[in-house]
Design a protein with these regions (language model features):
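ATP-binding glycine-rich loop module of kinase domains
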Residues: 2-40, 44
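Feature marks short, surface-exposed loop/turn motifs that line or immediately flank catalytic pockets
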Residues: 33, 70-71, 131
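Conserved kinase catalytic-core helix
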Residues: 44-51, 73-118, 122-123
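Conserved beta3 strand of the protein kinase N-lobe
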Residues: 54-57
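Conserved short submotifs of the Hanks-type protein kinase catalytic core
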Residues: 59-71
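Catalytic activation segment of kinase domains across protein kinase-like and atypical kinase folds
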Residues: 113-141
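Active-site activation/catalytic loop segments of kinase-like enzymes and analogous catalytic loops
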Residues: 139-162
Length: 162
């Protein structure tokens, strides 16, 4: 096993690993075993629909599919007004898939770093916590994140026109 890259994470250690056969996977090592169990349960329930597939795991780690793509945050920060619509649609698709699986619950953290875009589809990568709520709450949390995210270009382009 060879570590190819370390991903940014506040609480956990997240690594891109190359196995002896050359295939890539992500190893997420959790600071807390309960968080690991929560995430494993969510990933197994989502079964690859809008999240990485589980390849294996242990007491405090999960090995999962590597979804090659770009961070939703990076796409958001570089998008022009026209691209914002397709980004919003892809995030909405994730929220709908999640809501179908976890009726009455939404992801606790909708930081755009927790999503990857691949071929126009949005995948979530942080499932340690979920909270009771509706799709409307998900959308409101995402809108708040987008509006309050601190950027250099006047705190983000205005995408709504009066």
């Amino acid at each position: 096993m060879k570590i190819i890259k370390k991903f940014e994470s506040k609480k956990n250690k997240v690594l891109l690993v190359q196995s002896p056969d050359g295939s890539l996977f992500v190893k997420k090592i959790f600071a807390n075993s309960q968080s690991c169990r929560n995430e494993l349960q969510s990933l197994l329930a989502l079964d690859g629909k809008c999240a990485p597939k589980v390849l294996g795991g242990g007491e405090n780690f999960i090995d999962m599919e590597y979804i090659e793509g770009c961070l939703f945050l990076d796409a958001f920060l570089s998008a022009d007004t026209e691209q914002m619509s397709s980004l919003a649609q892809s995030l909405w698709g994730f929220f709908k898939d999640y809501a179908r699986t976890f009726k009455g619950y939404v992801p606790a953290d909708v930081n755009f770093r927790n999503f990857i875009l691949r071929q126009g589809k949005c995948y979530g990568v942080d499932f340690e916590e979920k909270i009771q709520g509706s799709l409307a709450l998900c959308v409101a949390k995402a809108a708040a994140f987008a509006l309050l995210y601190d950027t250099d270009e006047n705190k983000k382009k205005a995408v709504c026109h009066a």
